[in-house]
Amino acid sequence: MKVAFHTLGCKVNSYESQAMLNMFEESGYEEVDFKEVADVYVVNTCTVTNTGDSKSRQMIRKAIRKNPQATVCVVGCYSQVAPQDIEAIEGVSIILGTQFRNEIVDLVEKYQQTHERIVKVSEVKQLRKFEDLNIDRFLHTRAYLKIQDGCNNFCTYCIIPYARGRVRSRKPESVIKQAKDLVAKGYVEIVLTGIHTAGYGEDLADYSFYDLLVDLVKIEGLKRLRISSIETSQITDEIIDLISKSKIIVDHLHVPLQAGCDETLKRMNRKYNCEQYYEKLSKIRKLVPDIVFTTDVIVGFPGESEEEFEKTYEFIKKVGYTQLHVFPYSMRKGTPAARMVQVDEKIKHERVNRLIALSHELNENYAKSQIGKTLRVLFEKEENGYYVGHGDNYLLVKVPSDKQLIGQLKNVIIDSYDEILIGRVV
């Protein structure tokens, strides 16, 4: 039996797809490319934007056209918040939301016996238990480790709390065990991920995200630990101190901004203002001088005037990120922001382009500042005679080498920059 996956959206979705694939493989299934004929198709959907919804529907229909006799499973955030949309597509066999993924193989076998559509989408508001989806192998050299699910913030633009529910933390012993297993299998870098990653522990009585970091850096053989995303309010003095002293936690933090204007942040229901945000990052830089910051920015949020956008633009330059992830605001039905006055799409598009150009400028300037320095690089692939990988600062680096370097962590002296850093192994 052959199974094919198509995953849309975030790293959490990628993690969950890999976990489901492992379950199928353990049951004797062979993975094939989504473009090929398969017995089972799994589409892991995204609903962060309208584009995510439409792409999800497109991939579902593509699977049905490829093999009308296949078992087509639809899971994830889109099917969680709008299962009726998926039910309207003829040919879908199984519909799950953001729960019950650990039952997917059994549900496929049940469907193949009865050929009766299965819809298993539960209300996530009351969920308080973390669904353990364990993975012991990845296709890449770095391993992702999902430590929590859900979000309690309810930003006015965001549909995700309705798709994922409240914060639910994985049991500490489960996280530590999986981390040790991954290191034992040869992974030297682990990336902590979740819907609101550093919200880990908010639902636990006496164990915090800081406590988890302390336990993880003690794992023998773990060389690099990366936090996929963390809010300024979650960066405690304890965490700053730990990063400054640890050789394991990388000097790179992705700290979502969303807007660099207090008026916009207030409408978004973000839990900080620009001054608080800037002070926290400045405090980190004092203790960790080499740290770099990347961020997310939403452009064209309802009510965003030209003046507000300019404030965001200037604030971004003031902070000095190394990269921006720029998203045009996408109205999500049922969120408070959907009822606000919307920004013209043309204006939104122009502002997005300005910030993307700024991101390229910031990234190039920072990359060139690394020439002559030594970076620690984890090599992930071979390409056109070079080995390519990411530094601790998440910049891409390539080196020529006669020796096989994939999966290895090496010190590299940076010699030049040509859209990517170029260096040589020390």
Name what the model sees in each region:
Residues 138-141, 151-153, 249, 259, ...:
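Short flexible coil/turn linkers enriched for glycine and charged/polar residues
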Residues 339-426:
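Terminal RNA-binding accessory module
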